[in-house]
């Protein structure tokens, strides 16, 4: 399969650069997997698509203010984007500067703080901070908005680029499907008899990296840390026993559940995953999906295509553009039920040069 099969033209005006006034006021495009039928709704209409006995699985990771500014002891300015917190004082980070810092060199953080560059691991730098990392980031860090939002972060982003149920600090990008849920909507979901469970996947900055190969099968995913607890395994089993559906809120919840069920059986799991779900890959756990609209040629669009079918997904995106849906992190959402027989892009016939 070619990466180019997953491209589409998106007007710049449809990129959502700010959140709406209320989380729940976004629009919802529903895609029925078995038929490909589309319907244009509001996000609060999601309640109509849920059934008593269903199980919704959310990602409770918390976005950390992972962007820091500072200077090397030699005076050169730099920007740090934390990719992963290793322990209380060490991180792996992307560092942007005119010259890369050398092992043993000191970095002075704007707003107060100091770090030492310990080692380089390919594109990432291991940094050790003099004080505990998470309190430092909360004090002087900036929210790591995605590159396509293309504006400085604002005070409101600390709240709005975060789900209302975020608990476990460690992500440098939000699990954006969850941004649409406010507390009253969660209470209404519970009142309908829908159960909830929480996994953790700390979303890394690699989620925004473009696919740099021509053939999908040649792509290697970045790794991210996740945890699927025994409570989630038990909740899924109970859902199956009562005839309910497992509904993943966001692609990170899908990747968590399917990573923990790679052999076909869901088991508790804690560790790194580099699972890459694209058309042709089976789904062992997830029956329905709440997700935002994703970037062209992204691995997330490929995951949705694997779930809903390639032609159905691309038709849905074309309809979303035609109807002016807002795209990406602060944009609108989809509710998709799984296609039982999804198809992949058709292989192009070789050209005849005779």
Curated annotation (Swiss-Prot):
Assigned GO CC terms: cytoplasm
Entry keyword annotation includes Cytoplasm: yes
Pfam families recorded: Queuosine_synth
EC number per UniProt: 2.4.99.17
Catalytic class of the enzyme: transferase
Catalytic activity from the UniProt record: 7-aminomethyl-7-carbaguanosine(34) in tRNA + S-adenosyl-L-methionine = epoxyqueuosine(34) in tRNA + adenine + L-methionine + 2 H(+)
Family matches, as Gene3D superfamilies: QueA-like
Protein name in UniProt: S-adenosylmethionine:tRNA ribosyltransferase-isomerase
Organism in which the protein naturally occurs: Pseudomonas syringae pv. syringae (strain B728a)
Lineage of the species this protein comes from: Bacteria, Pseudomonadati, Pseudomonadota, Gammaproteobacteria, Pseudomonadales
Gene name tied to this protein: queA
